[in-house]
């Protein structure tokens, strides 16, 4: 008895030491990431190799001549001759005293404006999160209903793919035209009350809700396939208690992703805030990057990271409260994929989407996407199936050539993000800081940071998206690995002589790769959207390249006069999204059956 008590006491002490060590590593990761990011931002004006004084002169007045006297005056007034290190030290020392410095452009204090912008963004985030959770609930209802009635059901993801395939800037522009211009139900621009946030909240919440709904639906299907569901049902436990337990079990898997989605709602609203002229944190940080306003840029990035770290800690704490006992005792139930056969629609849907893209490519690749020989904004006809754009170019040709460009680039970036997320997710405590930082920085801000160093282009857009796109995959990997390693049979493997390498290759990895591959395929249209967003803002391929984002940007001013200039690239993007998600579901089932 005493020996058993001694063993239990030692085990509890080892667990406490592990938790303390893990918490210290996580805290150290966040601190190092925050410090490294601030230092990198402080060095940004000098990393591009251009004179910061010249960039500031051009930002203040494009007509003023860049004389040596004018540049010297700017360097002296802002202390640029001290170098980036001394400027960073001065900014940090002032921040500790409640002073974030003065704007290099306006000369006004930075902190009050950023605090007000953060308040606006948080309000918009809360309303967008409400829209996202409501939409995710609607998407998950069929899976939840069938699971309670004994059928482990995974949807084809058609509706969630449709929602995630809508670019936020395109959806925002559509809602602006319909809700504010045509119907006149909501104000079109500005921020003067909660009714100004309705259209922006819908534009931000609908794509996030489609993404969250698919992830949560997959997690629900996996939970309903666990053996304890059958045990509870046979034991006569009510459906209400089973439903509560299923929700608790599923939340433990997706809680880190919910935290990341909440953070991304704050940072990814740059385009939406720009379209609706909302004075939020994303728009303020975007303006600081464009203007090379270092104090405002540092403060904006700092606020984004603080919000990211707060929601990351909150999500991790809630998840630990849900799974604390199971993680400590290594009693996590094993998850298996639903044994349900592929439905007819799940087999036909990707074939239909692939056929549609193939027809688009066959019909459009032989056409010239650069030649302007048609009337401006010509409507669709037999000669112009998709119509013509504002410059008289064939939209079918431009969308077809843009499909090749965007799809190949998005696939390459998705594979890079999967590899990075899988590798980094295996060490969640060490890389928790970079993960939260990568998710806090929207692709637009990352694109601006990359463009400010290497210039605009497709390669810069791909680097920017890959630099931040791995974060959700890494978080998902960390959550899955934690649960897989807490299963009883995994805990018994070292006792049976199974080494670390074999344990991960033959037991952890097969249980991990299916959900991650589906997650990657679900993010493929999102990455294509991010590429389109950067192209829409002029940070991607240079004109007149037929890139999806640029085609969308060129057609947005004419949305009310000729909707077909936007409908064509948006439809192609929706088809790609639906095909990617439906193929991911089929791939996941085949992998599990082979395993």
Language model features: what each stretch is:
Residues 17-27, 139-176, 341-347, 404, ...:
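Cytoplasmic-entry segments and transmembrane alpha-helices of multi-pass inner-membrane transporters
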Residues 28-40, 240-269, 407-420, 501-533, ...:
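Transmembrane alpha-helices
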Residues 35-83, 185-199, 362-390, 542:
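Hydrophobic alpha-helical transmembrane segments of membrane transport/permease proteins
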Residues 38-55, 257-286, 295, 301, ...:
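Non-cytoplasmic
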Residues 80-137, 389-390, 394:
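An internal, D/E-rich "acidic patch" concept
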Residues 127, 156-209, 385, 434-475, ...:
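Generic hydrophobic transmembrane alpha-helix motif, especially the helices
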Residues 193-233, 238, 456-506, 515-524:
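Membrane-cytosol interface at the C-terminal ends of specific transmembrane alpha-helices
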Residues 298-340, 468, 514, 522, ...:
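C-terminal transmembrane helix and the adjacent membrane-cytosol boundary/short C-terminal tail
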